Amino acid sequence: MSLHIADHPLVKHKLGLMRQNDISTKDFRALASEIARLLTYEAVKDLPTEKHIVDGWAGPVEVDRLKGKKITIVPILRAGLGMMDGVIDLIPSAKVTVVGFYRDEETLEPVEYYVKTASEMSERVALIIDPMLATGGTLIATIDTLKKAGSKKIKGLFLVAAPEGIKKVQDAHPDVEIYVAAVDERLNEAGYILPGLGDAGDKIFGTR
């Protein structure tokens, strides 16, 4: 697995604002979208292009166009929806695949409750988006689901990640690339990232 940690002053500044405990829902939501946009820019640098001839103002001109099927964005419900706008801003023609999991209270393992994939998944780059990569369990389950649907190239975009989760995903799916704004210190006993952002879903949807 390739791990890409954003090294950009704008990302660091915006993430710092998100760490404030008294941040408003409006600001948290806006910053999540803005960082998602910046992470997307990095994550799609290797997309293939092909040459096309178009009618320019002074005659025919050769231009680059993206090659192949459109990307599919994969928000993990519910918090992943908070990063959607930032990704869609850059890739407005992207298809959307939606996955949802809940945690079994006895086994603590993720249980799939909703999946709706785009068509021809084997021909699309899949961009998983979720604010937090904590234990890695939900991400691994999501990757498993996408691979069963035919996905061959998968990338994940996260605001913050814990070393424990990164290691777990790396062991399970070494072919998946991870793009993250920051790698934090550790997980606490309850599985929350420290220092982290708190409950990103609650902050995005105003349900805290």
Swiss-Prot record:
Entry keyword Glycosyltransferase: yes
Domain of life of the organism encoding this protein: Bacteria
GO molecular function annotations of the record: GTP binding; magnesium ion binding; uracil phosphoribosyltransferase activity
InterPro entries: PRibTrfase_dom, PRTase-like, Upp_B, UPRTase/APRTase, Ura_phspho_trans
Regulation of activity: Allosterically activated by GTP.
Transmembrane stretches, start-end: none
Pathway field: Pyrimidine metabolism; UMP biosynthesis via salvage pathway; UMP from uracil: step 1/1
Binding-site residues, 5-phospho-alpha-D-ribose 1-diphosphate: R78, R103, D130, P131, M132, L133, A134, T135, G136, G137, T138, D199
Keyword match Magnesium: yes
CC cofactor note: Binds 1 Mg(2+) ion per subunit. The magnesium is bound as Mg-PRPP.
Biological process according to GO: UMP salvage; uracil salvage
CDD domains given in the database record: PRTases_typeI (cd06223)
Pfam family, one: UPRTase
E.C. designation(s): 2.4.2.9
Keywords: Allosteric enzyme, Glycosyltransferase, GTP-binding, Magnesium, Nucleotide-binding, Transferase
Residue positions binding uracil: I193, G198, D199, A200
Catalytic activity: UMP + diphosphate = 5-phospho-alpha-D-ribose 1-diphosphate + uracil
Cofactor(s) essential for the protein: Mg(2+)
Primary role: Catalyzes the conversion of uracil and 5-phospho-alpha-D-ribose 1-diphosphate (PRPP) to UMP and diphosphate.
NCBIfam families reported for this sequence: PRK00129.1 (NF001097), upp (TIGR01091)
HAMAP family given in the database record: Upp_B
Family the UniProt entry places it in: Belongs to the UPRTase family.
Name of the molecule in the record: Uracil phosphoribosyltransferase
Originating organism: Desulfotalea psychrophila (strain LSv54 / DSM 12343)
